Design a protein with these regions (language model features):
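Conserved G1/Walker A P-loop phosphate-binding module
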Residues: 1-114, 148
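C-terminal-of-GTPase-core extension/linker across diverse P-loop GTPases
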Residues: 2-8, 13, 19, 147-354, ...
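Short, glycine/charged-enriched secondary-structure capping and boundary segments
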Residues: 22, 84-87, 116-119, 220-224, ...
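Residue-level signal for pocket-adjacent positions within structured domains
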Residues: 25-33, 40-42, 50, 54, ...
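Amphipathic alpha-helical transducer elements in NTP-driven molecular machines
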Residues: 35, 49-52, 65-71, 85-99, ...
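Conserved Switch II/interswitch segment of TRAFAC-class P-loop GTPases
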Residues: 43-48, 75-85, 96-159, 172-186, ...
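A ubiquitous short alpha-helical element
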Residues: 59, 129-133, 242
Length: 367
C-alpha cells in the first residue's frame, strides 16, 4: 500500500531534524541554511502500538513486526514556490505524490537559527505555505477547465457537469480558501476530481509545532496561536521538540520514558504524529500471533476479510475460506487463542466480514 506522509514547511524550521528522528537515523541533511534538502528523502517508519507488546507477552514470539508508514522529507518551500521560486515547482510535485501533509512550524525563538522570513510568526508561515498550495491548485484546475470546456462544446458525456464543478471549486480557491474547505467536498464528483488532479490543498494536514525544551510541558504563545488557527480550520496540532526527539534516537525505551518524564510529558511528539498520520490515511491494523512472530498488518478501514488477507499474500485472498477472529481485548484477557476459544470468544467469519482495528486473525484458505 503506497500511502505516504509528506513533511513540509519553510526552510530551517526543523523538517529534516524531524525526519531523522522519525527514521532513527541521520538520513536527511540538516543545516542552518535554506534548501539543504533538495531531493526528497523517503523512509518507512514503524507505527507505535502498545498492543503488540501485550500480545507478545502472551505468545512469547521470536520477533515483533510493526505496521509501517512512509514519510517523505520534502525541501523547504518559500513564498513564490508555485511560480518556481526556490525550486518550488519540483517540491510541490513531490507533495502531490503524498496523501497527508505534516506541516512543521517553528514555534520557538533562537537567534542562532535563521528564519527565511526574518522573524518568528507561525501563522504567517502557515499562510505562506497554504497560499502556495492553493496557487498551485488554481494552476492545475485552470488546465482542467480548459480541457473540460472543449469536451463540453463537443457534448461529451458528463463534461458540462464536471465543468460546472471545476469552475465552482476554482471560485472557492480564488477566495484564498483551501479545497479541503469546499462545501460540496463529500460529493462523488468532487472526490473524483480531487483523485484525478491530486490537489494539494485538499489533503489532510497535521501541524507539527516545533518548540524548544521550555515549550514541551507548557504551550507557549506561538503554539496557542497555532492551535486556535488549526481548530478553526479543523486540523490537528501536535507539539514536538525536534532537537529532543533526535536525542531520543539512541536511547532505549526505558531511558526514553525516563527522559520524557523528567520533561513533564508521557509520550514523544513523534509517536503521536505517527499514529495521527496513520489514522488520517484511513488505515487500521489487525494482528497475527504465533510463536515465530506477532505482527501488525496495515489495511484500509472498511476492508472485508479476503481483501485484508491479501496483504499477507495474494493466495490468501484467492483461496479464502474463513477467518478465525478474536478481538485484541479477548485475546489478552483470556491468555491467548486457546483461552479465548474455550471462553467462546473465537468467531468464524466469512468473506463479507469487515475487519476491525485490533482483530487477531488466523485465515483459512485453499489454493
Amino acid at each position: 500500500m503506497s500511502l505516504s506522509v509528506g513533511i513540509v514547511g519553510l526552510p530551517n524550521v526543523g523538517k529534516s531534524t524531524t525526519f531523522n528522528a522519525l527514521t532513527k537515523a541521520q538520513n536527511a541533511q540538516s543545516a542552518n541554511y535554506p534548501f539543504c534538502t533538495i531531493e526528497p528523502n523517503r523512509a518507512m517508519v514503524e507505527v507505535p502500538d502498545l498492543r503488540l507488546a501485550e500480545l507478545a507477552r502472551t505468545v512469547k514470539p521470536e520477533r515483533i513486526m510493526h505496521s509501517l508508514i512512509e514519510f517523505v522529507d520534502i525541501a523547504g518551500l518559500v513564498k513564490g514556490a508555485s511560480k518556481g521560486e526556490g525550486l518550488g515547482n519540483k517540491f510541490l510535485s513531490n507533495i502531490r505524490e503524498t496523501e497527508v501533509i505534516l506541516h512543521i512550524v517553528r514555534c520557538f525563538d533562537e537567534e542562532n537559527i535563521t528564519h527565511v522570513e526574518g522573524g518568528i510568526n507561525p501563522l504567517r508561515d502557515v499562510e505562506i505555505i497554504n497560499t502556495e498550495l492553493i496557487l498551485a491548485d488554481i494552476e492545475q484546475l485552470n488546465k482542467k477547465i480548459e480541457k473540460l470546456s472543449k469536451e463540453a462544446k463537443a457534448n461529451q458525456k458528463g463534461a458540462k457537469e464536471n465543468l460546472e464543478l471545476a469552475n465552482s471549486l476554482l471560485a472557492h480557491l480564488n477566495k484564498g480558501l483551501s479545497a479541503s474547505s469546499y462545501p460540496e467536498k463529500e460529493s462523488q464528483s468532487y472526490q473524483a476530481l480531487i483523485k484525478e488532479l491530486r490537489l494539494l490543498s485538499a489533503k489532510e494536514v497535521i501541524y507539527g509545532a516545533n518548540v524548544d525544551e521550555k515549550g514541551i510541558s507548557e504551550d507557549n504563545d506561538y503554539v496557542k496561536a497555532l492551535k486556535e488557527y488549526a481548530k478553526k480550520n479543523k486540523h490537528e496540532v501536535i507539539k514536538l521538540c525536534a532537537k529532543i526527539e533526535e536525542e531520543l534516537v539512541g536511547l532505549s525505551d526505558e531511558e526514553s520514558h525516563e527522559f520524557l518524564s523528567s520533561l513533564g510529558v508521557s509520550e514523544s511528539g513523534l509517536n503521536q504524529i505517527i499514529r495521527t498520520a496513520f489514522a488520517k490515511l484511513g488505515l487500521i491494523s489487525y494482528f497475527t500471533a504465533g510463536v515465530l512472530e506477532v505482527r501488525s498488518w496495515t489495511i484500509k478501514k472498511g476492508w472485508k476479510a479476503p481483501k485484508a488477507a491479501s496483504v499477507i499474500h495474494n493466495d490468501f485472498e484467492k483461496g479464502f475460506i474463513k477467518a478465525e477472529v478474536i478481538s485484541y481485548e479477548d485475546y489478552v484477557n483470556y491468555k491467548g487463542e486457546n483461552g479465548a476459544k474455550e471462553a467462546g470468544k473465537l468467531r468464524l467469519e466469512g468473506k463479507d466480514y469487515i475487519v476491525l482495528d485490533g482483530d487477531v486473525i488466523h485465515f483459512r484458505f485453499n489454493v
